């Protein structure tokens, strides 16, 4: 792999505030997404991902403000996901400074959204977010990995491996693969899931869910991911971006 491995902090934003506790002593307001994104930029993050977890649509414009303020002081690619339902939503996020836009539930409900966005803005803009988990008990999917929605609370019955393959055909430029089983456990990424997806798609995979220590990151790249994403280990100051990059470098991977 000649391309540099990307290290990406993820910020969950609810009504303009970062949720999932953040502990940085040098920030005046650790709940401010713009300040936090700027801190990660200073730390050497390769990209920033914002996930708008606001339930109500009344706060949609708040996210636009967050993105445009961040774009003024953070000069690395920015992906914004959550609540993106139409090509118009994508357009408004790109106009205010996002480089890429993540789609999830809306694409499951209407897969043509992927091709409509890709045709209009280019594949490189579209990141398909997949919240997948291993099936327990009776298996309904061929791979044993199922797509979920509502933060893992709702089963779709859709095979996650089939879905990423289909999304690539429709024009997705990248897969944000989030393991709902590993998410929050700090016990490492779901390597088997990453391998299964890598076998089926050529587009980049961002591994998400389960990072707890620096040693967790190289195996995800070894399994086939092109980038690694984490939230709480960075927010709580357990690890810095530099820690993760040093570990990846130690294992022979190129980092920026």
UniProtKB/Swiss-Prot annotation:
Active-site annotation: 12, 131
Keywords: Amino-acid biosynthesis, Cytoplasm, Histidine biosynthesis, Lyase
Biological process annotations from GO: L-histidine biosynthetic process
Catalytic activity: 5-[(5-phospho-1-deoxy-D-ribulos-1-ylimino)methylamino]-1-(5-phospho-beta-D-ribosyl)imidazole-4-carboxamide + L-glutamine = D-erythro-1-(imidazol-4-yl)glycerol 3-phosphate + 5-amino-1-(5-phospho-beta-D-ribosyl)imidazole-4-carboxamide + L-glutamate + H(+)
Position of the signal peptide: none
One GO MF term: lyase activity
GO cellular component: cytoplasm
Pfam families for this protein: His_biosynth
Disulfide bond positions: none
Assigned EC number: 4.3.2.10
Enzyme class, UniProt record, top EC level: lyase
Domain of life (superkingdom): Bacteria
Location(s), subcellular: Cytoplasm
Pathway: Amino-acid biosynthesis; L-histidine biosynthesis; L-histidine from 5-phospho-alpha-D-ribose 1-diphosphate: step 5/9
Family: Belongs to the HisA/HisF family.
Assembly and binders: Heterodimer of HisH and HisF.
HAMAP family xrefs: HisF
Role: IGPS catalyzes the conversion of PRFAR and glutamine to IGP, AICAR and glutamate. The HisF subunit catalyzes the cyclization activity that produces IGP and AICAR from PRFAR using the ammonia provided by the HisH subunit.
Name used for this protein in its record: Imidazole glycerol phosphate synthase subunit HisF
The species this protein was found in: Bifidobacterium longum (strain DJO10A)
Organism phylogeny: Bacteria, Bacillati, Actinomycetota, Actinomycetes, Bifidobacteriales
Gene name tied to this protein: hisF
């Amino acid at each position: 792999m000649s391309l540099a491995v990307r290290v990406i902090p993820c910020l969950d934003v609810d009504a303009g505030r970062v949720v999932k506790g953040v502990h940085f002593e040098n920030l005046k307001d650790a709940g401010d997404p713009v300040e936090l994104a700027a801190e990660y930029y200073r730390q050497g993050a390769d990209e920033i991902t914002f996930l708008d977890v606001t339930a109500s649509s009344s706060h949609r414009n708040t996210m636009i403000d967050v993105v445009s303020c961040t774009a003024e002081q953070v000069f690395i690619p920015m992906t914004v996901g959550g609540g993106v339902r139409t090509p118009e939503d994508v357009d408004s996020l790109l106009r205010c400074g996002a480089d890429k836009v993540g789609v999830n539930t809306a694409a499951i409900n209407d897969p043509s959204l992927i091709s409509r966005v890709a045709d209009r803005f280019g594949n490189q803009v579209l990141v398909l977010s997949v919240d997948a988990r291993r099936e327990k008990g009776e298996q309904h999917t061929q791979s044993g990995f199922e797509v979920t929605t509502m933060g893992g609370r709702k089963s779709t019955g859709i095979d996650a491996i089939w879905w990423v393959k289909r999304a690539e055909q429709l024009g997705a430029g990248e897969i944000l693969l989030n393991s709902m089983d590993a998410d929050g456990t700090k016990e490492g990424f779901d390597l088997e899931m990453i391998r299964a997806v890598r076998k089926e798609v050529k587009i980049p995979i961002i591994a998400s869910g389960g990072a707890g220590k620096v040693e967790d990151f190289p195996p995800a790249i070894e399994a086939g991911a092109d980038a690694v994403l984490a939230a709480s280990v960075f927010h709580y100051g357990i690890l810095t971006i530099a820690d993760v990059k040093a570990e990846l470098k130690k294992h022979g991977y190129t980092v920026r």
